[in-house]
Amino acid sequence: MMPVGFSQGLSFDRKRTNWNGTGPRPLAWSVWYPANDEAIETPPSAPSWFKQEAVAHDAPIKLTSDALPVVMLSHGSGGVAGGLGWLGHRLAQSGFVALAVNHHGHTGSEPYRPEGFLCLWERASDLSALFDADDWKEALGATFENHAHVAGFSAGAYTALLLLGARVAYSQFEPDNPRKSPVRGPREFPDLAEHIPSLLHDRIFLESWNRRRENFKDERFVTGLAIAPGRSVLGFAEDSLEQINAPVQIIGGDADTIAPANECCVWLHKKIRSSSLEILQGGIGHYTFLPEPTSQGIKASPEIFYDSGLQRKSVHDHVARTAIAFFKACR
């Protein structure tokens, strides 16, 4: 199995501002890629909630005569790029370049912002802008395919579907949404809905809020993997889902109480004609799709890492095998 290289960097989307209005929107990225055969992988040394695989930091990429396939990864609500490192690492072992971003204001890598949690559509533009960016391409020094696959977990699944043509009818927490959310915010921001009235007086938020029904489809994204899509997908315009023709693989867990599969995954599958659905059995919860924990992670947030009677690694192995086969079949 080929060594996996890993690099990180910071791009900017100069077409959009950060939430403070003090500069361009940041796109902090992480990339897993097939490294050359001589690359030396070393275990991570920095403390983390997540178990991390050994990688070859900034190693030369394994060059081939063909352009390399790219998979863009989108983390869940309040998460980080490394939250999909388990998938990125396995994709790289199979020859893919897996590029993930920390979604500004909606990531644990920086202070949470209610704007970031409310304006989920900005996440789609993050991936489009990052795919355009030159710095990660120059850092890796290879030729890449001019189209990409996209995979996302939870809010990341919402992001993936926006790029494939889903359009917003209602934000999950907007007052006019006829489908009332059973919660007022996610685990990371439980009073999120209460921030909307005051934020509507903020120019930067209002500009983004008024973009929510725009079309974020990017024709360069040719397939999508939606892992445990959250309740936010129920705010998509149904006719836009019916018009998606790109292949979509939906994966959920039978014991997901955050985004119940029968409520979210099954609903999407019925609306997206080009989709396939797999609901994993055996007590698979929402957070099973996050990385395996370290002792530090278990101590800090046991509810995220509790898996009753299952091996999280085996679930990740299965999802990664499904993803690799799916993306290879759609190239």
What are these regions (language model features)?
Residues 90, 116-146, 161-162, 167, ...:
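Alpha/beta-hydrolase active-site loop
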Residues 234-236, 257-263:
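Conserved alpha/beta-hydrolase "acid-adjacent" motif
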Residues 244, 250-252:
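Short beta-strand/loop motif that positions the catalytic acidic residue
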Residues 39, 53-56, 60-68, 73-110, ...:
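Short substrate-entry loop that stabilizes the transition state in hydrolases
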Residues 152-156, 160:
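Gly/Ala-rich beta-loop-alpha elbow adjacent to hydrolase catalytic centers
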Residues 150-152, 251:
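Short beta-strand immediately N-terminal to the catalytic nucleophile in serine-hydrolase-like folds
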Residues 1-72, 93:
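Domain-level recognition of soluble alpha/beta enzyme cores
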Residues 284-331:
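Catalytic active-site module of serine/aspartate enzymes centered on a nucleophile-bearing elbow/loop
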